[in-house]
Amino acid sequence: MEGEERKGEAGPGPGRLSALQEQLIWALLGSGLSREVLVHALGELERERVTPGAEKGDRGDGESSEEGEMDFPPPIFQELEALAPEEAARQRALVDQLLQEDPWRVAKLVKSYMQQHNLPQREVVESIGLNQSHLSQHLNKGTPMKNQKRAALYSWYVRKQGEISQQFTNARHALGSGEEQGEDVRKGRRNRFKWGPASQQILFHAYERQRNPSKEEREGLVEECNRAECLQRGVSPSQLAGLGSNLVTEVRVYNWFANRRKEEAFRHKLALDMPYNSQSASSTNHTLSHSPEQGMKYSQQITCDNLGSSRGHNGDRGLGGRLASPIQLEPSHTLLETHHHKPVSGGGPLPPVSTLTSLHSLSASPAPHHGLIMTSLPSVMSLGESSLLIGQTVPVINNVGGGFTTLQPISFQQQLHSTSQQQLTQQFQSHMGHHHSPFMATMAQLPCHMYSKSDMSHYPPSSLLSQAMVITDSSSLGTLTSLTTVRQILTTDPEEQTDQPIQEDSLHLQSPSPVPVSSGNLQLYPPSQSSESHPPHRLSSSPADINSYIPAQMVSTAQ
């Protein structure tokens, strides 16, 4: 109790204890603690707050750093112990002084010194054993660092200052023992040469003037760069040897210019390749978007497949050598062909009408279109007094009332003489001329191909079956059906016109009467002929009546 009274009497010196503090003291004394034990415990707490408290606070500041990284002393501390006692004491005093200052201000000071002397962070990492990422964050952003790590960093900074100052001080007589000592010091951690900002500015200005300087010009640049490096470090240019590994040489200047020329050539190549890459990419996208159309092929059904055999059976020498059989033609012709572009000459065959199929809905279209008839008529050929036998299919595309559209080949023969040729041409052009549609007016401007007998030798046999596409409305089909249906016979000599007529039973539709046609099911080939040719195409049912669209001349034969 006597100690309690003394404690209470000693308390009101600077100020009286609060009621809570008095309760705490009475509780401690009441727990069995004596006055001596309590005073000793207070002294221990005060000592821990002064010395170990700083280390404890340093742990709190270094929470972002790697734990357990500095369990062993850094290598820089071992090197510091190897120095002379006076030098070691001096460096420890400088390190303690830096530890008392603001860490962020000291970090900026160390970073500025490293940039001034072109010192890489790798050298710091190898000297103090610190993580380079943590060191970079501390120097650039002021990331908190433990006192032990900061002490290692500041120890390296202080020692490096002394080494560099000694290099420039002893630069004049460093050719002797000093150079060997420097080699021994840098043997384990040789720094890589790094261009300083002052030297780079000089070299870039020189590169703008001359991209490939001569050796004399490079030597002049070496002197300018070394002078700038010395001034950057705050030393006299006479202390040039103090630059050490950062000394600029003629070989390094030559390599710098060579690297810049390579970089410029590479950038120029990239600039040239950029438009080509963009163009190829756009063309690739365009090709991919149109790839379904490239694979579409439109075939033409050829029904006159026995033409060559009938010619050989009847022994017609002239026709065998001059007339081309439809079998010689390719059975499939492409209207949209991208891989093989065949030039279309004046006497070459026009591409046949393609097999176009389109399914339209009557309810979707507000007004049904007129039925369109697309036919492929034989070309009009003038061969003097002789005539040409044309026996081929005429594909007809019929679109009735917006219904199903399909291709229907019709086989018929015509004999066109000089008078009938002119009539056919006049009728066709007059019909197209009176049509008011712009598209039909454009089609009317297409000329009918006229050939003479002398020009036929310049064309392949397939040109004898050239076609002319006719597109007309179903309402004007009467003009088309009024064309004269005749037959032409080609002979090699006008005197052979009186020979025995050629039997062409296999080329004609042997039906005494026109084939019955109905709007429900349109069949343009009788079953007797479809067995030896391609299967017939049938038009689907359509609500409109197309009986008036199919003339008898197009399905009958002219005997």
Curated annotation (Swiss-Prot):
Q: What is one GO biological process annotated to this record? A: positive regulation of DNA-templated transcription
**Motif annotated as Nuclear localization signal, chain positions:** 186-194
**Which terms in the GO cellular component ontology are assigned?**
nucleus
Task: List locations, semicolon-separated.
Answer: Nucleus
User: In which residue ranges is the amino acid composition biased (Basic and acidic residues)?
Assistant: 49-62
According to the UniProt entry, its GO molecular function terms are: DNA-binding transcription factor activity, RNA polymerase II-specific; RNA polymerase II cis-regulatory region sequence-specific DNA binding; transcription cis-regulatory region binding
UniProt keyword annotations, A-Z: Activator, DNA-binding, Homeobox, Nucleus, Transcription, Transcription regulation
Q: Where is this region: Disordered?
A: 49-73, 492-559
Task: Spell out the Polar residues composition-biased ranges.
Answer: 499-522
Q: Name the principal localization, coarsely classed.
A: nucleus
Family annotation (Pfam families):
HNF-1_N (PF04814), HNF-1A_C (PF04813), HNF-1B_C (PF04812)
The source's superkingdom equals Eukaryota
Q: Where is the HNF-p1 domain?
A: 13-44
Report domain POU-specific atypical positions.
78-173
Region (Interaction with DNA), start-end ranges: 121-123, 134-140, 146-149, 192-195, 252-254, 259-262
Q: Please describe what this protein does.
A: Transcriptional activator that regulates the tissue specific expression of multiple genes, especially in pancreas and liver. Binds to the promoter of the albumin gene.
* Name recorded for this polypeptide: Hepatocyte nuclear factor 1-alpha
